[in-house]
């Protein structure tokens, strides 16, 4: 009696590629900005996007926009879109959403942070080291907002 071959149900995750998709650095008020006392106000905006490229293969984009103002004037604006191609197979929907919305951005963030730091230094501004981001907490907040919004729509 032949036994049926067991189906492979083991989850699989792999990084295929990490790449820089888009980058921009603007210093609209230089060189005048270099003559002023440096007391920066740093604003960080971030966003993630993901899309399926093929069966079990996903592109995740982490977009970071850093705007630094000094004395109410923009010193510089830096935007980086750090991309990654990931294999994520045999995951339940919730696990896949967490993987694409938190785990992959955690992998991409150090690359984007290094690119921003390098661009800022090349613009001859003081080095900017972005603090780590807790993408797991951001993802949980997103899920809570989605649940609250669905609850409000049903009421």
From Swiss-Prot:
Keyword annotations for this protein, in alphabetical order, are: Chaperone, Cytoplasm, Protein transport, Translocation, Transport
Q: Where in the cell is it found?
A: Cytoplasm
GO molecular-function annotation terms?
A: unfolded protein binding
Q: Which SUPFAM superfamilies match?
A: SecB-like
Broad class of the protein's primary localization: cytoplasm
Q: What does this protein do?
A: One of the proteins required for the normal export of preproteins out of the cell cytoplasm. It is a molecular chaperone that binds to a subset of precursor proteins, maintaining them in a translocation-competent state. It also specifically binds to its receptor SecA.
Assembly, in brief, is: Homotetramer, a dimer of dimers. One homotetramer interacts with 1 SecA dimer.
Name the chain's protein. Answer: Protein-export protein SecB
């Amino acid at each position: 009696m032949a036994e049926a071959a067991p189906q492979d149900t083991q989850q699989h995750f792999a990084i295929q590629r990490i790449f820089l998709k888009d980058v921009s650095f603007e210093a609209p008020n230089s060189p005048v900005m270099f003559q002023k006392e440096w007391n920066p106000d740093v604003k960080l905006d971030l966003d993630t996007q993901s899309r399926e490229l093929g069966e079990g293969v996903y592109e995740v984009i982490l977009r970071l926009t850093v705007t630094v103002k000094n004395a109410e004037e923009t010193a510089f604006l830096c935007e980086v879109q750090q991309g990654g191609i990931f294999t994520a197979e045999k995951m339940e929907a919730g696990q896949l959403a967490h993987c694409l919305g938190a785990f992959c951005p955690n992998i991409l963030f150090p690359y984007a942070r290094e690119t921003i730091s390098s661009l800022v230094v090349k613009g001859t501004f003081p080095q900017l080291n972005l603090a780590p981001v807790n993408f797991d907490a951001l993802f949980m907040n997103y899920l809570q907002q989605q649940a609250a919004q669905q609850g409000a729509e049903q009421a």
